[in-house]
Amino acid sequence: MNIESIDSLLKHVDPVLSNVLNNALSEKEISVNDASELYKAQGIGFHLVGMVADELRRRRVGDIVTYVVNRNINFTNVCIKQCGFCAFSRDFREEEGYFLPTEEIVRRAKEAYNLGATEVCIQAGLPPDMNSNLYEDVCKAIKTEIPNIHIHGFSPEEVLYGAIRSDVSIREYLSRLKDAGVNTLPGTAAEILDQKMRDKISPGRITVKDWEEVIKTAHSLGINTTSTMMYGHIESTEDRVKHIAKLREIQKETGGFTEFVPLNFIAEEAPMYKHNIHEGIRHGANANDVMLTHAVSRIMLNNYINNIQMSWVKEGQKMSQLLLSWGANDFGGTLMNESISTSAGAQHGQLLKPNQIRQLVWEVGKIPAERSTKYEILRKFDADTNDALDNVDSNQFGSYFELIKINEFKYKNPRRG
């Protein structure tokens, strides 16, 4: 829909909403209060929020929809934290705890690289008594075997844990990770950047203050990060827009975020949902809420973060296609392995092949392109091709549910003597 059509429709909606959307189209910064109004939109106003977000997406990045060929390597599910939303982690005494040795991590990275991956994403639980050099050793081992692969590794929670285990500052530890081969950090462990909220859903998790310190320090060292938000649980829409505004302020200061990813809460196996720990906890966000959240993200971040990624693992293929008209422009990664959403009850698999992504993008009239982690365009496609990963059965990569049952990588509890 062209801008003239949007202008015409804006005359027929609530004046407050119309004013906010007009400001967005004028590329003015949208306040927290104004962004909250977008969540109240109904009827034609609801659709106009999506139209405006789509127009801003078109101006910012055009009709190219990107994806990255990558592999997730969640090398252990053993964790000293017990977050209410996490069905992935296991206590070190549980039988389902696993821990991949460095040689297996490297094997998985090499397998992915040989199938065309440009990135490995490395995240895991926080095992007790962790060797302080573990993260560095893993990165060095990967880079020794595959010097050209991009390591997108270690959330702010893991960085803080590594710094504590090493008894050094966050800055010193990040410098060590960079020297060891870390190229970028996932901006996960953010959930909602409100301390009272975090104390409810994940007591003991990294604080807002420490999360910000890790992110800003990484940016100051030339380490880009992503940014994320987990929504659809007990937070309010005001909590969401304040979270996005906080990320916007960080981006103004550092310019280090490459993307923003709204992450819908997967409830089925999440402890705080299964045991009804919090009054009013929701079963994730519904379809309209998901669409609005991606649109609000684009509108609030328009002048600051170019790339809005949807999570096909959480939303599925059809909803992901729809979100490409609600402000999103990135399909994320091929993944090959996915443990965290799957363990919580997601049903959309762990591998989306490059030719599948390209087809999904073409079906909605946009142009697929493979990108690097930092959003450099590697290949644009006007006709399909056949990549190595397109010919692989996803069973080749194993699964989380197999991993927690086999003995080969079972976590060995150091406290058993």
What are these regions (language model features)?
Residues M1-I44, R107, Y113, Q251-G417:
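Auxiliary Fe-S-binding modules of radical SAM enzymes
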Residues E27, A53, C83, I122, ...:
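Conserved, mostly hydrophobic/aromatic
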Residues S36, R71-N72, R93, Q123-N133, ...:
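Glycine-rich, proline-tolerant flexible connector loops at the mouths of alpha/beta enzymes
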Residues L48-F92, G97-Q123, L185:
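N-terminal pre-triad scaffold of radical SAM enzymes
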Residues A109, E136-K140, L174-S175, E212-I215, ...:
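Generic structural signal for well-ordered alpha-helices
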Residues A117-I215, S220-S227, H233, N307:
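Conserved SAM/AdoMet-binding glycine-rich loop
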Residues S169-Y173, I234-R248, E315-W326:
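Catalytic cores of alpha/beta
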